[in-house]
């Protein structure tokens, strides 16, 4: 169906383009191969290599106007631009797009009809259109007949900005305009910008409607009990939420309403570097399936994907519809969470493997969003480096973290959900001295928490962070439960714990003006021994 005469494209100013409206998988494969965008692996997936191999958070801008001036938390990842800059780049992009071949997908962001937004994504690359089709919620044929977009994404990677003339940082740009309900993307082929751009939009819009947007995975037990898993990269979020005894609601983005949780997406965008087919069989199968997009995966001479080759990037990805996973909740919705798990990989080795959080600690840990990077090969880096990403997703959160924390605390109070902090990092010493937390112990602890096994267990409070630790969990040695007991040198543990507590306090200073005093009162400095 041609879109050349629709009001939308007239509004955009794109003339004489060859448009493919809601093309299917076969058509998009054919177009991507014809245009030289990628290759089809012998096992079926479309394999593409991109100029940028990750997101460009420093090139993301939000239009500052009357709507956003006092509602966006400016600074950090939220950089303002003027409406004039946006309009000028939009004009240049639409003229650049004239006469080109473009692909249009009409999709929903959100599985809950009450809160979803309708999104029209116009892309220069066929593979981006397949990515969008895989990742978002696909409307029914009837819904497509009456589709009216709330938001428009225009993504033209070959259009590169002139930083000096166009008022942006580099040739790459991601511009979000909440007043005009548009996202412009240029100068990058990385498909994740389509997904995370709309995630940021939902993270801005939904709190106004009392919905908590979350960067987390979600699954459901046999009895319908829902669990959420928050965690930064490398904490085990994907592995630990992929439980054969629980059905997957979604792996990355969710909203929490007055009735329960819903997935923002209709697909998954999984990291696949060194993916183990025995440890992650469901995700591995998707990397061998027709319809999947494999991003920056290297092909072997026989045309099969080499998931162990990170020569292009360690950030190799598989984008596939969630329906390719067998053990899912097909409607992408569930009730109120019974348990919430914050995952952290503490390379300092001082946080407990599992602790129970109070409502105030929940807000504090959520705003902090802590994990730690291990020392690399960089000269002079000999100790773990703390990483704080507020709300476990700082690049995607336009509002003040205090807003999200208050909303989460309200939802936790109303639902009575248990909140757990789980350390998947080090024990018995920091990185280089201790050992990585046993995945079996972590699974045992999480299963005990989700099953209600810990409801009647005695807890003790550790002195440095005020965290409540279970004194006994079947299958986990007692000396593992209390991190101080796992260290041979108790004085070294105390020094390291105080050091990490100071890092938490220092990081939290930038949030204190926008959070409740009760959160500040739960800070480690009030517990320091």
Swiss-Prot record:
Keywords: ATP-binding, Cytoplasm, Decarboxylase, Gluconeogenesis, Lyase, Manganese, Metal-binding, Nucleotide-binding. Its main location: cytoplasm. It is found in: Cytoplasm. Pfam families: PEPCK_ATP (PF01293). Its cofactor is Mn(2+). GO terms for biological process: gluconeogenesis. Mn(2+) binds at residues 196, 215, 252. The keyword Ubl conjugation does not apply. ATP binds at residues 196, 215, 231-239, 280, 317, 442. Pathway: Carbohydrate biosynthesis; gluconeogenesis. Its EC number is 4.1.1.49. GO terms for molecular function: ATP binding; metal ion binding; phosphoenolpyruvate carboxykinase (ATP) activity. Substrate binds at residues 55, 190, 196, 317. Binds 1 Mn(2+) ion per subunit. It catalyses: oxaloacetate + ATP = phosphoenolpyruvate + ADP + CO2. CDD domains: PEPCK_ATP. One of its GO terms (cellular component) is cytosol. Involved in the gluconeogenesis. Catalyzes the conversion of oxaloacetate (OAA) to phosphoenolpyruvate (PEP) through direct phosphoryl transfer between the nucleoside triphosphate and OAA. Belongs to the phosphoenolpyruvate carboxykinase (ATP) family. This is Phosphoenolpyruvate carboxykinase (ATP). The lineage of its organism: Bacteria, Thermotogati, Deinococcota, Deinococci, Deinococcales.
């Amino acid at each position: 169906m041609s879109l050349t005469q629709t009001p939308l494209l007239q509004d955009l100013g794109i003339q004489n383009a060859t448009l493919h409206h809601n093309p299917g998988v076969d058509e998009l494969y054919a177009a991507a191969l014809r245009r030289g965008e990628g290759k089809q692996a012998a096992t079926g997936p479309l394999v593409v290599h991109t100029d940028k191999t990750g997101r460009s958070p420093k090139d993301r801008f939000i239009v500052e106007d009357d709507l956003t001036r006092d509602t966006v938390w400016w600074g950090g990842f939220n950089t303002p631009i003027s409406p004039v800059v946006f309009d000028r780049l939009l004009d240049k992009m639409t003229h650049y797009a004239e006469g080109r071949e473009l692909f249009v997908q009409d999709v929903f962001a959100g599985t809950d009809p009450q809160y979803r937004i309708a999104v029209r994504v116009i892309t220069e690359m066929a593979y981006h259109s397949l990515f969008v089709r895989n990742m978002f919620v696909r409307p029914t044929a009837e819904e497509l007949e009456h589709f009216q977009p709330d938001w428009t994404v225009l993504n033209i990677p070959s259009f590169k900005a002139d930083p000096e003339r166009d008022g942006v940082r580099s040739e790459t740009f991601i511009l979000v305009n909440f007043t005009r309900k548009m996202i412009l993307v240029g100068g990058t082929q990385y498909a994740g910008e389509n997904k995370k751009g709309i995630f940021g939009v939902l993270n801005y819009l939904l709190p106004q409607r009392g919905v908590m947007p979350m960067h987390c995975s979600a699954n459901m037990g046999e009895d319908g009990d829902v669990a959420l898993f928050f965690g930064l990269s490398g904490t085990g979020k994907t592995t630990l939420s992929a439980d054969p005894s629980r059905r997957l609601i979604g792996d990355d983005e969710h909203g929490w309403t007055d009735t329960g949780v819903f997935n923002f997406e209709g697909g998954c965008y999984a990291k696949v570097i060194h993916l183990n087919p025995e440890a992650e069989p469901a995700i591995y199968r998707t990397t061998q399936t027709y319809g999947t997009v494999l991003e920056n995966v290297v092909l072997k001479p026989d045309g099969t994907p080499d998931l162990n080759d990170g020569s292009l990037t360690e950030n190799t990805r598989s984008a596939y519809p969630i329906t390719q996973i067998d053990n899912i909740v097909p409607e992408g919705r569930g009730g109120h969470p019974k348990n919430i798990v914050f995952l952290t990989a503490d390379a300092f080795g001082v946080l407990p493997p599992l602790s129970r959080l109070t409502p105030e600690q929940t807000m504090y840990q959520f705003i902090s969003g802590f994990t730690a990077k291990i020392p690399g090969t960089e000269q002079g880096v000999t100790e773990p480096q703390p990483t704080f990403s507020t709300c476990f997703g700082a690049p995607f959160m336009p509002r003040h973290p205090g807003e999200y924390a208050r909303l989460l605390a309200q939802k936790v109070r109303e639902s009575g959900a248990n909140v757990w902090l789980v350390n998947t990092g080090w024990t018995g010493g920091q990185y280089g001295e201790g050992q990585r937390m046993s995945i079996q112990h972590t699974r045992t602890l999480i299963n005990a928490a989700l099953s209600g096994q810990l409801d009647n267990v005695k807890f003790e409070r550790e002195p440095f962070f005020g965290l409540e630790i279970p004194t006994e969990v079947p299958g986990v040695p007692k000396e593992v439960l209390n991190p101080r007991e796992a260290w041979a040198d108790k004085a070294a543990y105390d020094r390291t714990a105080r050091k990490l507590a100071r890092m938490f306090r220092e990081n939290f200073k930038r949030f204190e003006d926008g959070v409740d005093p009760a959160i500040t009162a739960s800070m480690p400095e009030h517990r320091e021994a």
